[in-house]
Design a protein with these regions (language model features):
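Short loop/turn motifs that connect adjacent beta-strands in outer-membrane beta-barrel proteins
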Residues: 13-18, 47-51, 111, 186-188, ...
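Outer-membrane beta-barrel signature, preferentially recognizing the C-terminal barrel domain
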Residues: 156-175, 359, 363-370, 424, ...
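Hydrophobic, lipid-facing positions within transmembrane beta-strands of outer-membrane proteins
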Residues: 4, 36-40, 98-102, 172-178, ...
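Transmembrane beta-barrel wall of Gram-negative outer-membrane proteins
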Residues: 33-136, 161, 171-178, 185, ...
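Transmembrane beta-strands of outer-membrane beta-barrel pores
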Residues: 25-29, 59-63, 120-124, 134, ...
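N-terminal periplasmic accessory domains that precede
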Residues: 2-23, 36-40
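Transmembrane beta-strands of outer-membrane beta-barrel proteins
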Residues: 17-21, 51-55, 114-116, 178, ...
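Flexible glycine-rich, low-complexity coil/linker segments exposed to the extracellular/periplasmic environment
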Residues: 146-158, 218-251, 302-363
Length: 492
């Protein structure tokens, strides 16, 4: 199945005129900046209370940050748990959120009512991350050539100047729905139609990663909550040790990512009382149609080789010290020089020849899923204390997916090929039975049987085959997967 469900709640229309305005602020000790929160709501009824209107807007600007350390452990050949990697990270994030909602309801007469609702949310996340990684910490001692086996990486995450030299993640969601409730004699009817769209854009996301090999580290308090490496790493060390000991540009990448999902729904439900009394019964029936599409498009290029040929070590003139004073995990984590976000953002990558990172594009896909369903439910009173409900639901699912096959051979030569469209159709019948027995006002017994389904997640359905023979890794999707069926018995 594509995604899940997101319940975007709009403010309901009021019974009388209402107005409210809110304002708030706060302070983040990491970013050392103030936050701002604003909100405005207005609602009223018009035309002799037949038309209700509710409008609301809100705005939030929150410059925040975080101090972070992360550790990775593994079990060695002796069965011992050893640390293999340690990281210290400094984050600075500014989140700006805007929300707009509008709701209407119109009472045509006591038997007919219409509703219209809409909501739009827009969120910007500007993030910079500074990360030091100590790798291969389990490889102590010297290798066969007498060299130390550990390494360090220093990385800056950012973006272009038009995005504040930060990684921008722009998420937008919108949801518009139209519905009605109607009474035709004994027959009750409700219906609804809705359109929703969610997008995520991450333009010009950049990483500058520097690596130094042939290092040896001492780790203190390994296995505790806050272990740390006592050996400082610095971009100013290693330049005089020759080619084997110098810092190298391991990665200079820029990626552009677009993800969007569209969701279209129609539904109609009916309820008809058949007879009244202690043996009364009623019938409910309806239908629903859901059409979803989801697309992921990521393209990434690595400019590390082009940078080295053009600029060599120019980055050394554009450094910034991070891992702030007061770093919350502890003062044992020292400040380090990183490539500045301003320098990373200023690089004109359009003038460099980059190499496409095919692995990043191997996860691209187009997915379409249509589900048509219908149901009926029969409610029957079996005297004053027993009630029975019988139901049956039919769901017809039609899916179409396409993706990419990524292949890496033993020589690490890569290729990326489209999979073409893969389709799958199936129908599920889902019965349900429920009995309810009211022994008295304080004691009630329920027994039920239901058949339900759980569809595979969309990422498992993408018809991709990613083979990396150099690392002996294989990842496959299967568009022919069908839902998991469960039979549920309940007594309460």
């Amino acid at each position: 199945a594509i995604g899940g469900s997101i319940n975007l709640v709009t403010k309901s229309t009021p019974y009388k005129r209402t107005f409210s305005a809110t304002a708030g602020t706060g302070y983040n000790w990491v970013s050392e900046k103030a936050q701002l929160n604003l909100g405005l709501t207005y609602g009223d009824r018009f035309f002799n209370n037949k038309l209700g209107v509710m409008a609301a807007i809100s705005y939030q600007n929150a410059p925040v940050g975080s101090d972070d350390v992360e550790f990775e452990y593994d079990v060695n050949k002796k069965g011992e748990v050893v640390m293999v990697e340690a990281q210290k990270r400094q984050y600075y994030v500014t989140r700006e959120r805007q929300s707009y909602s509008l709701a209407f309801d119109y009472d045509i007469n006591p038997n007919h009512r219409l509703t219209l609702q809409g909501i739009y949310n827009r969120r910007h996340d500007w993030e910079n991350r500074y990360r030091v990684t100590y790798k291969d910490l389990d490889k102590t001692g010297l290798d066969d050539e007498g060299e130390m086996q550990q390494s360090a990486q220093i990385e800056t995450k950012g973006g272009t100047p038009n995005n504040k030299n930060a990684r921008l993640e722009l998420q937008q969601t919108m949801d518009f729905s139209l519905g009605g409730e109607h009474q035709f004699g004994k027959l009750s009817m409700d219906w609804g139609a809705s359109y929703a769209r969610a997008t995520e854009d991450r333009p010009n996301e950049r990483y500058f990663n520097l690596k130094q090999d042939f290092l040896g580290f001492d780790v203190v308090d390994a296995g505790d909550r806050f272990p740390y490496v006592t050996t400082d790493v610095s971009l100013h060390n290693g330049k005089a040790d020759g080619e084997r000991g110098k810092w190298k540009v391991k990665e200079l990448t820029e990626s552009n990512q677009e993800i969007y999902e569209n969701d279209l729904k129609f539904k109609v439900n009916f309820e008809l009382p058949l007879t009244n009394g202690i043996y009364g019964n009623s019938l409910k029936f309806g239908a629903k149609y859901v059409s979803k599409t989801k697309d992921r498009d990521v393209i990434c290029y690595d400019y590390a080789d082009a940078y080295k040929d053009t600029y060599d070590t120019e980055y050394m003139n554009n450094l910034t010290s991070q891992i702030r004073d007061g770093f919350m995990p502890g003062s044992q984590y020292k400040a380090t020089d990183f490539v500045s976000k301003e320098y990373l953002g200023s690089l004109n990558l359009a003038n460099m020849e980059g190499e496409q990172v095919l692995e990043e594009s191997s996860g691209n896909y187009h997915a379409k899923e249509n589900v048509t369903s219908a149901f009926f439910r029969f409610d029957q009173n079996l005297g004053k204390k027993i009630k029975m409900m019988l139901g049956l639901r039919m769901e017809a699912t039609h899916i179409k997916y396409n993706g990419w096959n990524w292949n890496v051979d033993e020589n690490e030569d890569e290729s990326l090929e489209p999979t073409g469209d893969h389709k799958n159709d199936y129908v599920n019948w889902l019965p349900s039975v429920l009995f309810k027995y009211d022994v008295n006002d304080d004691f009630k017994v329920r027994a039920s049987f239901t058949e339900t389904l759980s569809r595979p997640k969309y990422s498992a359905l993408i018809p991709c085959v990613n083979i990396n023979r150099s690392d002996n890794k294989l990842v496959m999707g299967n568009p022919d997967l069908t839902p998991t069926i469960s039979y549920n018995f309940d007594l309460s």
